[in-house]
Amino acid sequence: LRITKSFKIMKSSVIIFPGSNCDRDMDVALKKFGFKNQMVWHNDAKIPKSDLIVLPGGFSYGDYLRCGSIAGKSKIIKSVIDFANSGGLVLGICNGFQILTETGLLPGILQQNKYLNFICKNVFVKIKNKENKYFKKIKKEILELHIAHNEGNYFCSMDELKSIEDNGQIAVTYCDHKGNEDEKNNPNGALKNIAGIFNKDKNILGMMPHPERMIDPFL
């Protein structure tokens, strides 16, 4: 995965929760692309001045109750919500996506995978909307990314789905290497093959695949 280094965003903050395990990978990825990254503990009240906040993957609080439910009520989340509501960029990867739905910053929920199994493999995804700061510099439409989750089955009400589709909020969908979106290329049973979504303003992005794992052979 190659990302053009023309972003003017230079300061990022990765939030660490008990059970996070992709925070260091994200730190490596952000620094590789020129970000001055800061690691922020979940119990801090405020986030340092940032252009981008990242909620990383992992198993925050051991995934007790529901994935992301306890993290969604942690001390730092108010600052994340305030930052997002002011137009700041917030990215949630895997467990971070689950946290964003738990806080209400993104619509829908992430359910247990269709076949009740943990999935760990590479998949292809199609970028559905490039009119945003996350994907506008990526030339490819189809990307190969890694997934590792037990609860990645995206679901929302039919009214929410219509709103999401009408507003161009579907960010990425599961597909094959040619871009075909169908059931056999849907690893977890997600509604409409959805792998990631935006909020209405496109400043918040949640996605189950891990782009940070594809930027360096070591990761």
Identify what each model region corresponds to:
Residues 1-93, 99-107, 113-119, 126, ...:
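N-terminal beta1-alpha1 cap of cysteine-dependent amidohydrolase-like domains
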Residues 11, 81-85, 110-219:
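Amide-donor transfer/coupling interface in amidating biosynthetic enzymes
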Residues 96-97, 131:
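Short, flexible active-site-adjacent loop segments at beta-strand->alpha-helix junctions, enriched
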